[in-house]
Amino acid sequence: MREIVHVQVGRCGNQIGSKFWEVISDEHGIDPCGRYHGDSDLQLERINVYYNEAFGAKYVPRAVLVDLEPSTMDSIRGGPYGSLYRPDNVVCGASGAGNNWAKGHYTEGADLLETVLDVVRKEAEGCDCLQGFQLVHSLGGGTGSGMGTLLLANLTDEYPDRITATYSVVPSPTVSETVVEPYNATLSVNQLIENSIQSYCIDNEALYYICHRTLKLMAPTYGALNHLVSLTMSGVTTCLRFPGQLNADLRKLAVNMIPFPRLHFFMPGFAPLTSRGSQQYRALTVPELTQQMFDAKNMMAACDPHRGRYLTVATVFRGRMSMKEIDEQILNVQKKNKDFFVEWIPNNVQTAVCDIPPRGMKMSATFIGNTTAIQEIFKRISEQFAAMFSRKAFLHWYTGEGMEEGDFAEADNNVSDLLSEYQQYQDATIDQEFEDEEEVEEQNDDSDEQ
């Protein structure tokens, strides 16, 4: 079987990660004690991707839970699904990272690293054919960002031929937890560019917009935000967990979605998103799902896809629906919005269908977009970073842990280069591509003649 080992790091990573396990356990008919109570063979057909079948038909998540302070772990252990996880796979420190990336990456996190890697190795050794890892973390704090990226770098070194996917919660100015978020996020994105194969960017600002505008929640809790993220993660992983043809493993998804290795930051979206009160007044149709799914208001990252162009898109429809109708609707969207899809990647929208809908829904659709508009998120972080770094504000907290100013400048430059690359491919046309190729050929011919 093609197994995936899941690693959740830091407070945010653990809260979202544990919600993800609740949602997919429910979808696969697994109760909080790990017993199967489902009603369909499809639930068990690929259960081994995320679960290990232990003694006495108990299904245990292939999950490693990491934090530098114990409070989140205590609440997970004390929660309804606390006994689902393997106790040995819960690793926590005592002191925390205090929202400091350097503590997570170089000092406190580094001290705990070998213990975590041992647990991950044990999980990986228990797999028949490991396809890769998924990391759930946030970029704004200290543990998820600093230790999360340290772990990612080590996994990339130790398992270079395996895919690493991250679900990364990006900080936003409207929902700020701490003043040093731009530093932590820039240092993290620098690492993700180099060490992640594919990253799903989830943005607190977008989640708040959805809760306010669409779901009509006046004071959204983190529970509501995490629920949105878990819906999206459940949708994104549908192809990996249930039998299907398209994007059925992490590598196939990467091959279809990533035309250039550094441009691997995806914008996820989900439909239907309707407020609880209005649900019973609407019968969902494939056209409506498709229209909602491509709508900026349904995106989990606060950037407008109409300000950029799609390099590639993958969509996952769930529920009983006609494949022909889905294909027609997707084609329709592409025709109507052809300016927002690069013309030099033909057939750049992939569609998968899974018969099993999420709990409580007849049908749903998940969107994964590789769009140049994602640069808006990085630009926002970069501007905030520059404002503080130009005054060297708060730097002493980082240099005190052994970092140097040069590390910050290097990270900022790498993010700036990424922005330029996105802009370059946003502006590229099919004619320009051919001209570039001809120029290269002419230069090669000239050098041959010499």
From Swiss-Prot:
Start-end of Acidic residues biased regions: 430-450
SMART domains: Tubulin, Tubulin_C
Highest taxon listed in the record's lineage: Eukaryota
Keywords for this protein: Cytoplasm, Cytoskeleton, GTP-binding, Magnesium, Metal-binding, Microtubule, Nucleotide-binding
Residue span of region Disordered: 427-450
Oxidoreductase among keywords: no
UniProt xrefs under Pfam families: Tubulin, Tubulin_C
Primary localization class, coarse: cytoplasm
GO cellular component: cytoplasm; microtubule
Record PROSITE patterns: TUBULIN, TUBULIN_B_AUTOREG
Disulfide bridge map: none
Function comment: Tubulin is the major constituent of microtubules, a cylinder consisting of laterally associated linear protofilaments composed of alpha- and beta-tubulin heterodimers. Microtubules grow by the addition of GTP-tubulin dimers to the microtubule end, where a stabilizing cap forms. Below the cap, tubulin dimers are in GDP-bound state, owing to GTPase activity of alpha-tubulin.
Family label: Belongs to the tubulin family.
Protein name from the UniProt record: Tubulin beta chain
Lineage: Eukaryota, Metazoa, Ecdysozoa, Arthropoda, Hexapoda
